């Protein structure tokens, strides 16, 4: 558990550097044969074909490339090569976040790859904006993450927030949780889809240098406990993919909140937002890229229904971690 949660901080990118805007199809003076120039000051300058170069300087701990587009378009990274010419997407492509309106690449997403100093190259399509964030400072012995909770309605979530804080503190991570802000009633029930206009408007209220948690009364179109805007979310980039949704209704039995489950869900989805995948997916064939997290193989599926449960995996295979593949919805009274 210690290695799992501290990995969050290795991947965390809350230090803004610089933003660049570009388009994959708007510069009419470019030609496809144009050679990309090395980005200066961390400003991405791809050519008309979407190919670009950027420099990672010595001392960089991690970096995150954002690509945004219209909500009905999925921006795509087709290549990311380190200074030695190694193509990271060959082995880590399945962990590159891709969704309509927003995609990203995070390095390191695995201990197999470091943000090596030197000239990196990339290729992207279907984007309207590109942005590069870098972390250049090491973590302190007791790192701190700023968290901003928002809530629709009058439920008291203070106990759940304390449970969430304790989950992180047991691994030496401090959560600086600010006072909960109350949302307007129009955000009481929203879509799970971060491209939905109402959801996007709500999430865009969040600051770019915090993890923004939105506790909503219910989803209009899903029965999830919660969901994050991405793995990772748009850390350092203010907008509609800069937050986590948590469904209060799904955590109630007989009208009462299950604070333990609510705190665990908040910690689970926050882990996704910071870049953590499930250690094992329920099919038992896909595992996260972090070496020190336990894997639960399909051979543990004792009832042969092709879906692993927490009981089948047990503590030995990571079922007791907050990032395990799923949490269980409570039974409604």
Question: Residue spans of the language-model regions?
Answer:
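Bacterial Sec-dependent N-terminal signal peptides
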Residues: 16-45
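Conserved small/polar residues in nucleotide/adenosyl-binding loops
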Residues: 325-333
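Active-site-proximal segment of zinc-dependent metalloprotease catalytic domains
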Residues: 149, 199-284
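Bacterial N-terminal signal peptides that target proteins for export
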Residues: 1-8
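Bacterial N-terminal signal peptides
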Residues: 8-17
């Amino acid at each position: 558990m210690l290695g799992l949660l501290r990995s969050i901080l290795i991947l965390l990118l809350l230090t803004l550097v610089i933003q660049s805007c570009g388009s994959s199809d708007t510069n009419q003076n470019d030609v496809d044969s144009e050679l990309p120039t090395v980005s200066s000051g961390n400003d991405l300058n791809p050519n008309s074909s979407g190919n670009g170069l950027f420099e990672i300087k010595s001392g960089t701990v991690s970096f995150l490339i954002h690509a945004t587009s219209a909500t009905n378009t999925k921006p795509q990274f087709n290549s990311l090569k380190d200074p030695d010419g190694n193509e990271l997407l060959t082995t880590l492509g399945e962990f590159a976040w891709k969704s309509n309106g927003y995609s990203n690449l995070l390095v390191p997403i695995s201990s197999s790859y470091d943000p090596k100093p030197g000239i990196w190259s990339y290729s992207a399509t279907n984007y309207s904006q590109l942005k590069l964030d870098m972390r250049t400072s090491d973590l302190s012995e007791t790192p701190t993450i700023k968290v901003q909770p928002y809530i629709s309605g009058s439920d008291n979530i203070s106990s759940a927030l304390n449970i969430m804080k304790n989950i992180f503190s047991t691994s030496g991570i401090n959560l600086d949780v600010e006072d909960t802000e109350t949302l307007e009633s129009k955000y009481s029930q929203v879509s799970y889809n971060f491209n939905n206009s109402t959801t996007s408007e709500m999430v865009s209220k969040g600051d770019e240098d915090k993890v923004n948690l939105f506790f909503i009364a219910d989803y209009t179109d899903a029965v999830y406990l919660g969901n994050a805007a991405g793995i990772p979310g748009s850390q350092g980039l203010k907008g509609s993919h800069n937050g986590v949704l948590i469904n209060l209704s799904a955590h109630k039995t007989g009208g009462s909140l299950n604070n333990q489950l609510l705190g665990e869900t908040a910690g689970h989805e926050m882990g996704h937002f910071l870049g953590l995948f499930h250690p094992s997916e329920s099919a038992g064939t896909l595992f996260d890229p972090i070496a020190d997290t336990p894997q639960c193989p399909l051979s543990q599926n004792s009832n042969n229904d092709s879906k692993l449960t927490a009981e089948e995996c047990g503590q030995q295979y990571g079922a007791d971690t907050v990032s395990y593949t799923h949490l269980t919805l409570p039974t409604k009274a």
